């Protein structure tokens, strides 16, 4: 019986390749699966590469909460929804922490774990990111906007400052 995760949301994804082992690539904070397209193209002959957008990122649905536990459950539900039993898992930055959570909680689903640009510790710069997120929330913009819509809504000078800080 497949477990049900009430907080999990369906993830938008891109897929490259039709043969070889399944490799799931999890992007970092403020990114999307699109960030890994050139990497996917470079190994497409050897793997089936799945690149989901995390909740509140890319084209995946937005949710009120975003914990590593929830993001790990999103990944496992993604695996279930796509008939993927045991996979290779690569995570970058935030995706690396999510990948570690998947491997820790669901070891039977992960044959290989690759973590890029992250360690299993709390980083002080997280507070800086949290301040940026709170500042963006205080701008009063609608919750569901694409990056293009945000760029049109804010003065160009402010946009340069925001993306420079990220």
What positions do the PLM features span?
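Structural cue for short, hydrophobic secondary-structure segments
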Residues: 25-28, 51
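Flexible "cap/lid" loop of the alpha/beta hydrolase fold
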Residues: 100-105, 109-150
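Conserved alpha/beta-hydrolase catalytic His-Asp/Glu region
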Residues: 142-166
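Active-site loop/oxyanion-hole signature of alpha/beta-hydrolase fold enzymes
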Residues: 14, 38-44, 50-90, 94
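Active-site glycine-rich loops that stabilize anionic/oxyanionic intermediates
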Residues: 20, 28-32, 93
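Alpha/beta-hydrolase fold catalytic core
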Residues: 1-23, 44-47, 84-85
């Amino acid at each position: 019986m497949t477990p049900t995760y009430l907080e999990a949301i369906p993830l938008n994804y891109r897929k490259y390749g039709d043969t070889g082992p399944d490799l799931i690539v999890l992007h970092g904070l403020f990114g999307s699966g699109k960030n890994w397209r050139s990497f996917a193209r470079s190994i497409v002959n050897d793997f089936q590469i799945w690149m989901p957008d995390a909740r509140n990122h890319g084209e995946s649905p937005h949710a009120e909460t975003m914990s590593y536990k929830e993001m790990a459950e999103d990944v496992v539900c993604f695996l279930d929804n796509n008939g993927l039993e045991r996979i290779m898992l690569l995570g970058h930055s935030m995706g690396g922490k999510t990948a570690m959570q998947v491997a820790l909680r669901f070891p039977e689903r992960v044959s290989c774990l690759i973590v890029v640009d992250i360690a299993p510790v709390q980083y002080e710069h997280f507070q800086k990111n949290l301040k940026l997120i709170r500042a963006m929330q205080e701008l009063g913009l609608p919750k569901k906007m694409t990056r293009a819509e945000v760029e049109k809504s804010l003065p160009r000078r402010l946009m340069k400052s925001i993306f420079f800080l990220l």
